[in-house]
Amino acid sequence: QGRPIRQNADVTITIRISLEDVMFGKNVIGRYTLRSGEECVANLAIPQGIENGQVVQIRGLGDNTHPQLPRGNLNVQIIVLAHADFERDRLHLRTKCSINVLELMLGDTKNITTLGGGTLALKIPKGLNPGTILSVPGYGITDVRTGQTGNLYVEVKGITPDLDRYEDIAKVQALYDELNSRS
């Protein structure tokens, strides 16, 4: 049983990234100070799909107080900031989409913005109930180790359309009366 190899102390820093950075990966600049007071700058490649709280270790960029010992490591703790429209669930993303109840009844296609800023045409089937969650395969986060990509889950929120003209209200009332007379 050999003695453990001694080395200089590790240094830990925290980097805050966005959910978009998780989706696509990002190079960031990490700035930190060693015990000696030396200011260090490191170019850090944050991998795609990294988890909140995960620590990335970079060997040999830590403390160097004792020159006779190997340099310590740099431990980079990742904090993923909350996103206004998307929530992460492992490899999956979750979002909400407000659709008026007439479109839910009749069916429609709605353009929704993806995490990357693109547009996705989301098919709303006829008779969809508010609160239904639609799954869009392949629009989640990709795990770089496995190549697996999660889904985008869209929760449909029903909203009442703005009926400010008397004619519109009368048409909806007539439809309501007709549907109620059938049941």
Question: What label would you give each PLM region?
Answer:
Residues 1-35, 66, 180-183:
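Post-J-domain flank of DnaJ/Hsp40 co-chaperones
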